Each structure stands twice: as structure tokens, then as C-alpha cells.
Amino acid sequence: MDRGLPGPATPAVTPQPPARPQDDEEAAAPHAAAGPDGQLGTVEQRLEPAKRAAHNIHKRLQACLQGQSGADMDKRVKKLPLMALSTTMAESFKELDPDSSMGKALEMSCAIQNQLARILAEFEMTLERDVLQPLSRLSEEELPAILKHKKSLQKLVSDWNTLKSRLSQATKNSGSSQGLGGSPGSHSHTTMANKVETLKEEEEELKRKVEQCRDEYLADLYHFVTKEDSYANYFIRLLEIQADYHRRSLSSLDTALAELRENHGQADHSPSMTATHFPRVYGVSLATHLQELGREIALPIEACVMMLLSEGMKEEGLFRLAAGASVLKRLKQTMASDPHSLEEFCSDPHAVAGALKSYLRELPEPLMTFDLYDDWMRAASLKEPGARLQALQEVCSRLPPENLSNLRYLMKFLARLAEEQEVNKMTPSNIAIVLGPNLLWPPEKEGDQAQLDAASVSSIQVVGVVEALIQSADTLFPGDINFNVSGLFSAVTLQDTVSDRLASEELPSTAVPTPATTPAPAPAPAPAPAPALASAATKERTESEVPPRPASPKVTRSPPETAAPVEDMARRSTGSLAAAVETASGRQALVVGKPSPYMFECITENFSIDPARTLMVGDRLETDILFGHRCGMTTVLTLTGVSRLEEAQAYLAAGQHDLVPHYYVESIADLTEGLED
């Protein structure tokens, strides 16, 4: 045998097992696990742009907010530039003549800026709730969670591919070792085989994690697809909120502009104004109003009742104390133009009560009808209670259906109001005195010289009819009643929602201020304040705690003259038809409450007040009483809500001296010249 140089070694060929189907699956697994293909792949490409869009739009929308983000209504309104503008206007028009064109325009502008600020605050709060918060969750929570799953899947797939490469290399090394002559039982072969087994187990575990993560990621993508339409609705909702905000703002501005132009005698030819049509509410017949709006209960009746149930049932002197003229006028205009924006008036129950009285008073025909006037009077004249009740029931049955429904609704409410008489001081008799002349009055007869005297007699009978209706409401109008008939107003529970903040307050002992220009005489002991006085004083303190509303200022005239004390202090019960009066000393009077326009005229024309002072709605100040007979004695004057002759007559006829003591005048006519019809 020749011994030469060794030839090249022939590598041992290790037989490879035939390819298995699962090997093909594993080869394709990294690609399949890397992410979805097809339609879901397209969805996957939309994730990052959607996240960026939600984030950027949320950021820009947040920058559009003018109020304090996340704050409640009151705090937000105070921070708005519009409210700062309204406050500046309110401070400015106090220095102007309120009867001047600029003063009137500035006062109305102040009120409208206040209203626009509240509309803006409501818009921003709705925007935060319905758009900003959902966009924040989408960009900061929902989409980042999906993208996090995607990133986790990519990392797992990368780790899996690395491990598969190591396993493949280890398998090759194990085969090479066996081909080079390593015996199956050798230490190196055993070590290599163990390594391969370990890598296979790790690869199987990692493969399971990849599949689990991929399933979760695909589920996230499917969830995103199903919710894409709801995400799009965020932007639709944004436009809806903006449209509602601009509509409400435009309605408020149109109403204010119409009033301003009317006051300035300028006819408005603006297309936007002439094209706007508001349903008729005040001054139109009940049947026409109900037909135009498709309602069962008149809008002012239901709206005012719902607001009073919410905030006013325990308000002392409700329906008796008058609201500010500007507030009442704005409430009536809002009732016709935008009844969904009445929330701001809930905190002023006297304005709400005034709006209800005004609606009943402005009906072309009284709610209890002209046709049945004589029948009501005959029923009231019956002395026997049972016969009177039966007669009233018979007259009620003859009312037109729409009148009966609204009268039943109103009487049920007034009966509930009377249940709180211990707090609100409004007994069925007091309620009837105030509201009776607004529910029924005789038909006008031209040329009837005796109508004034007849009105005084009929007022007494009307009060008796209405008082009986209130006292017997459950008998005359059986069954429970749902005051939220239309479903347009928030349901209220009287025991839970009626505020009793005024019921627990008392008039402070320091309530009577003394002007710096007039030395105050030593007052004689006076009786306790009348209910109306306490109510007005407590209301003034309460209103100082809520956001201020522009009042109706009246600049007064000459300064008062200091008068000598009255010699006869025994004379008592002096006052006006529209005032509760108590005698004190000197010739000074304390004016408390919210005067009606008529009482404003009486005060500004007949009172002498320091010209440095400005008479505002709700102010209290000392002055001389100079209208009627100059009684020459001190009085404490509390203005009430009497604004019609019939109401004044009803006060006197009922002998309600706690409400309206007699005034020393020649006749009722002495005080009726300025009364509004």
C-alpha cells in the first residue's frame, strides 16, 4: 500500500429528513406574525394618522376655550372676557343718565353681554364633555394602547426570528458533529443535543407568545374598525354644538337689537331680523297659542310653574313682590324666542311669577272666560259652602276644553303653593287677591261711567271664586297631575329641590341705612317688619351672592330736606295702595324691594333723594314720602307687585292690612294715574 500525502477529506453527508408541512408553516410564520395583511393592513396604516389628528385637534380646540377648563358654571362665567365686559358696562352706565339714549343702549348691551357669556360658558362645557374629553381618551388612551400592542408584537416576532436562527444553527452544528465521527453517546454530542432541545422549547414558548400577542393586536384592529364611525361623530357633534351656540347667540342678539331699535324709533329692515319668525306667546288667545305650538298647556304657564316648583315654592311673597322691569321683559322675550334658554331665570322666582301673571293678564279673554263671568259671580254669591262648591263645579264643566285644562293645571299648582304658606306667607286668600284679577275680569263696556265702582265690587267676588277654586282644587279637579306635561322640562321633586335658603333668614337689625347728607332722627319703637319687608330684604342679600344681573337704574332728583319729627305719633297705618307701611319718626322712608315700573315712576317723580345716590332695583334708602297726602310722618315703605287697579282694589276690599294698609288719599283715583293696563 502506497503511503503518500493524504488526499482531501470527504465530508460526511448527514441524511436530512424529508421536509414536513409544519416546517413550511414555521418558515412562513415570521412573515404572518409580523402584522395583518389585506384590509386589516390598510386599517393598521390609519392608526398613527388618527392618533396624530386626535391629538392635534384636541390641542387646538383646547386653545379655543375662553373659560377656565374643567371649572363649574359660575367660576367659568366669571373668567370669561364677555362677563368682564358686562361688568364694566354695568359700572359705566351707573354714571350716565339712564333716560339718555347712551344710557339705555349701554344698559341693554350690559344685559346681552351677560347673557352671551352664559351661553358661551354652556357651549364650552358641552364642548368639553362631548368632544374634547372623547378626543383626549382616543389620542391618549385608546389608540396608544393599540400601537403598544403592535410594538410588543414586533419585538416578539424579532426575538422569535433570532431564536429560530440560533436553533437552526445549533441543529446544523449538532449534525456536523455527528458527521465528523462523534459518537452518539459522547459528551460533546450530548451537550449539543441538550442545547438543541432547550432552544426548541424556548422557540415553542416564544411562538405561543407571538400568536397570543398577534390575536390581541388583531382584536384591537377589529375594535378600531367598528368604532371608526363613532370617532367620526366627535367632529359631527362639534359642528352641532357650534351651530346651537351660534343660533342661541343670534337669537339673543336679535331680541336685544329689536328692543334697542324700537326704543330709538328706528325700524329694522335687516333680512336676518325680518326672516326670523317666533311663535306668538303673549297677547294672543289661548286657543291660537296652543294650536300654533301644538301644546295642551300654554308654554308660559307650564314653563313658569316648572321653574317655580324647582326654585320658588318657599319664596316669601311669591306673586306679590315685583321683579325688576328689565329682567321681566327679557324673560318674556326669551319665552317667545328661545324657551330652551330659561335656566338663568330660575334663580329669580319673582321674575318667573311676574311672567306668569303677565301672561294671564295679557290674554285677550280671561282664562275663566267672559261668557261665564256672570255664572262665576252667581256661584261666588252663594253663602252655603256645599251649594257654592256644586255651582263652581258646574261652571267649570262648561269651560272650553283648553281653558279647563289650563285652569286645572294652574289651580293644582296654586294649591301646592298654598301648602307652603307657613314659609311663603301665601295663603289661598293672599294668592287669590294677587292672581284673581288676572284670571277673571268683566267685559269692557264703552261709555259705562260706573265701571270703576263695579270693578271694585267684582274684584271682591273674583277673589272669593279663585280662593274657593284653590281650596277645593282636589275636589273640583280630581286626580293627580304631571306638571311636566310636554316633557320639555326637567322633572322636579318638590321636597328635594325647593330651596329654603330664604325661609331661614331674618331681616338684620342694621338694615336701615342713614344718608350722610341727612341726619337721622331718633326713631320711635316700631312694630316688627311686615312679611313683604322681610322678604325683600332677604332677597336682596341673596341676590348679592349670585352673579350680578344688570338692574334698571333710575337717577333721582333734588336732595331731601330735613324735616322735624312728627308730633302725633299715634297715627298708624299710612302707606300706598302698593306698599306695606309702618310708622316710625320724622319724614324719612325706607324703600326696600324691587319696584314695578309704576312704583319707579312714583318714587322718581314724588320722592326727594340725594342726587349723589342712584336708585337701583333692590336698593334700600331713606327718603321723604311726598305723594298722596303729605302725611308728615315717617314710614317704612316696602314695594309690592301690584300693577293693576283691580289688584289694588282687591287688596283694599279684602282688608289685608298686613299687606296693604289704607293710605290717606281722597280716592283710589289719586293713585291710579300711572297704573299700567
From Swiss-Prot:
User: Which InterPro entries does the record cross-reference, listed alphabetically?
Assistant: AH/BAR_dom_sf (IPR027267), BAR_dom (IPR004148), HAD-like_sf (IPR036412), HAD_sf (IPR023214), RHG17/44/SH3BP1-like (IPR047165), Rho_GTPase_activation_prot (IPR008936), RhoGAP_dom (IPR000198)
Q: Where is the composition biased (Pro residues)?
A: 516-530
- What Gene Ontology molecular function terms does this protein carry? GTPase activator activity; linear polyubiquitin binding
Biased-composition ranges, Low complexity, are 1-13, 29-39
**Single GO cellular component term:** cytosol
Residue positions of the PTM Phosphoserine?
S183, S270, S272, S552, S558
Give UniProt keywords alphabetically: Cell membrane, Cytoplasm, GTPase activation, Membrane, Phosphoprotein
User: What kind of membrane protein is this, topologically?
Assistant: Peripheral membrane protein
- Tell me the ranges covered by the Rho-GAP domain, including all copies: 284-477
| Compartment(s) | Cell membrane; Cytoplasm, Cytosol
Q: Where is this site: Arginine finger?
A: R320
User: According to its UniProt record, where is this protein mainly located?
Assistant: membrane
BAR domain mapped to chain residues:
25-270
**Expression sites by tissue:** Expressed in brain (at protein level).
Signal peptide residue numbers: none
Q: What does this chain do?
A: GTPase activating protein (GAP) which specifically converts GTP-bound RAC1 and CDC42 in their inactive GDP-bound form.
UniProt-recorded name of the protein: Bargin
